[in-house]
Curated annotation (Swiss-Prot):
Gene field: dapA
Active site, per annotation: 137 (proton donor/acceptor), 165 (schiff-base intermediate with substrate)
Species of origin: Nitrobacter hamburgensis (strain DSM 10229 / NCIMB 13809 / X14)
Keywords from the named record: Amino-acid biosynthesis, Cytoplasm, Diaminopimelate biosynthesis, Lyase, Lysine biosynthesis, Schiff base
Keyword Isomerase part of the UniProt annotation: no
Site entry (Part of a proton relay during catalysis), positions: 48, 111
Annotated EC: 4.3.3.7
Entry-linked PANTHER family: 4-HYDROXY-2-OXOGLUTARATE ALDOLASE, MITOCHONDRIAL, DIHYDRODIPICOLINATE SYNTHASE
GO cellular component: cytosol
Pathway listed: Amino-acid biosynthesis; L-lysine biosynthesis via DAP pathway; (S)-tetrahydrodipicolinate from L-aspartate: step 3/4
Name under which the protein is recorded: 4-hydroxy-tetrahydrodipicolinate synthase
Complex and partners: Homotetramer; dimer of dimers.
Subcellular location, record wording: Cytoplasm
């Protein structure tokens, strides 16, 4: 039950820019600075959207360090520290803490399909190794396992477990988790399209892919609903819905990078086995950005 009051609002799941086969530090730092200037409430480097599966561990650590250094304490940084190897997750989490991260995001172990008890011990081992908050990342569509509400409740008894990034897209989970763990258990939506409904059910914020492209709009939506102004939130959502759909027509990180390319902020290079979006999807993304008022 870690201190978790600051984890509210719109947290951008940052893309990782590449240039000439390497991570582009200058472009990444520029992205971080722009995001903060646009009013985002927090940053999440090297998660799924940051292409963590195709980063080396050295690259992963450098991106975390650059993000923390560039943020300079202006917004919280929740560093990705997930792995399907508990030992690797611990190593990444320990590094993130030493680098100055405010919290770590730890995904449910993917591919090896652990039991609920196995997942409990995975998170407990990370919990016991560090002294900063841990946000559980529950994403059954990618991990093939779903951390149950009951297991989350057990984990919330540990000192550093602060909440969940819930990418189930099942809004009912928000109410079930709120009932089981109470309102202090931080619930961050991991789905842009359902984030407004997620907040209405008791959520605290969103870890957003679309915020890469529309940071000010995403932050404004979250700020409005956190104040109970759902009319304003819905009006902003109406502007963003086509963009939510467009960015995820193909892998979301590729869609986000294409949107950032259209804004002139970075190249859309991704690492295999992912590819840049196709021209038809690129047109849909552009049209959606025009609808949102991001492009003329």
């Amino acid at each position: 039950m870690a201190s978790k009051t600051k984890f509210r609002g719109s947290y951008t799941a940052l893309v990782t820019p590449f240039k000439n086969g390497s991570v582009d530090e200058a472009a990444f730092r520029s992205l971080v600075s722009w995001q903060i200037g646009e009013g985002v409430h927090g940053l999440v480097p090297v998660g799924t959207t940051g292409e963590s599966p195709t980063l080396s561990h050295d690259e992963h650590r450098k991106v975390v360090e650059w993000c923390i250094d560039e943020a300079r304490g202006r917004v919280p940084v929740i560093a990705g520290a997930g792995s399907n190897s508990t030992r690797e997750a611990v190593d990444l989490a320990v590094h993130a803490e030493k680098a100055g991260a405010d919290a770590v995001l730890v995904v449910t172990p993917y591919y090896n399909k652990p039991t609920q008890e196995g997942m409990y011990h995975h998170f407990k081992t990370v919990n016991d190794a560090i002294g900063i908050p841990i946000i559980i990342y529950n994403i059954p569509s990618r991990s093939v396992v779903d951390l149950s509400v009951e297991t989350m409740a057990r984990l919330f008894e540990l000192k550093n477990i602060a909440g969940v990034k819930d990418a189930t897209a099942n809004v009912a989970r928000v109410s079930l988790q709120r009932h089981a763990m109470g309102p202090d258990f931080i619930q961050l939506s991991g789905e842009d399209m359902t984030a407004l409904a997620f907040m209405a059910a008791g959520g605290h914020g969103c870890v957003s892919v679309v915020a890469n492209v529309a940071p000010k709009l995403c932050a404004s939506l979250m700020s409005a609903v956190l104040k109970g102004d759902y009319a304003t939130g819905l009006a902003i959502q109406d502007r963003l819905v086509p963009l939510h759909a467009a960015i995820f027509k193909e892998p979301g990180l590729a869609g986000a990078k294409h949107g950032l390319k259209l804004l002139g902020r970075l190249d859309e290079v991704v690492r295999l086995p992912l590819l840049p979006v196709t021209p038809p999807t690129g047109k849909v993304i552009r049209d959606a950005m025009v609808h949102a008022g991001l492009l003329n």
